[in-house]
Curated annotation (Swiss-Prot):
GO annotations of cellular component type: apoplast
Annotated protein name in UniProt: Aspartic proteinase CDR1
Family: Belongs to the peptidase A1 family.
Residues carrying a glycan: 93
PANTHER family attached to this UniProt entry: ASPARTIC PROTEINASE CDR1-RELATED, OS07G0603500 PROTEIN-RELATED
Propeptide segments, given as residue ranges: 26-73
Amino acid sequence: MASLFSSVLLSLCLLSSLFLSNANAKPKLGFTADLIHRDSPKSPFYNPMETSSQRLRNAIHRSVNRVFHFTEKDNTPQPQIDLTSNSGEYLMNVSIGTPPFPIMAIADTGSDLLWTQCAPCDDCYTQVDPLFDPKTSSTYKDVSCSSSQCTALENQASCSTNDNTCSYSLSYGDNSYTKGNIAVDTLTLGSSDTRPMQLKNIIIGCGHNNAGTFNKKGSGIVGLGGGPVSLIKQLGDSIDGKFSYCLVPLTSKKDQTSKINFGTNAIVSGSGVVSTPLIAKASQETFYYLTLKSISVGSKQIQYSGSDSESSEGNIIIDSGTTLTLLPTEFYSELEDAVASSIDAEKKQDPQSGLSLCYSATGDLKVPVITMHFDGADVKLDSSNAFVQVSEDLVCFAFRGSPSFSIYGNVAQMNFLVGYDTVSKTVSFKPTDCAKM
């Protein structure tokens, strides 16, 4: 009898412990937001006077400008990467504060800090939309110099001896900059077809001194990189370090938007999923690196010679903010030759785009299947991932050479559900009709 009583008591204790553990566990979040291409009619950057060809050529030029600000310092073994202030191809509607104050910001996997221009603005670039005034938010709070939020910024943070308030200073590769206070506030985001999600105590940069080439129609940046103050790292365990996006093709209907998912909404599973290791580099923790082994053009496989001669691991950055896929010049030349030799058509020139491999689009152009062989994951590209129509009668290869850095751009990622798991350190790809998500 005593033994039975002890067993029952032990079972009750275990159940009680399990209940308390579940009660104390933080709920996992799952939510989705719209990603608006900067050339969409829903974007403040949209210019109705431009043709689709002009918009695409502008995006190509932005790709080149973005990578040309990747520079290497002689005294460091790892490259030092600077991005232009006006780079990034996708926008998010987010709101800051209580009550929510809406801003349209660039969503950037190549940046960390979420920042916006704030009133009063001592020295700011012209902005079409109203500035966020922290005094109007009941949940806004400047953080102290000794806070974990301030120390997470490391060399980008500074402190005022007068009031112990944490300040930040960010400079971009084109000499633009933003300076202001580090604070925490409520961030609200969501999409047109889901309930808005409120995220409390999110680190933001409240910029009171900003200048350079920032576009007056933009309101700031949402950093989705791998650094300690990025939105992904801040949400941390609540989203299990997971986010994913599905980018609709450039040829989609104008009213269709891409999606970005977080947490339980970001799981990539099912038939057709392939995964590759996500490589972390301590000196460049913002950027998401993958390992590219080779590229196949039809049955011809070309071994990849990456830009990082010290290691073949982590030799290409996956980036949503760059349109083209950019590869080291010599390797790209070999790839272009393989693509050209497999296409039975006359080459055309397009000096406006700067792309070197173009063909007439008036006939039935048959292009080879191109497969990206990442470490452990073969990603087969559709023709729309490898070629872009730059005008009514011209299509061009959506890859090009770069002086040193390799970037897996967003055209190659369109109509794939691309999932990042920063805990398991993997990136997954699943062919998906993104317009139906």
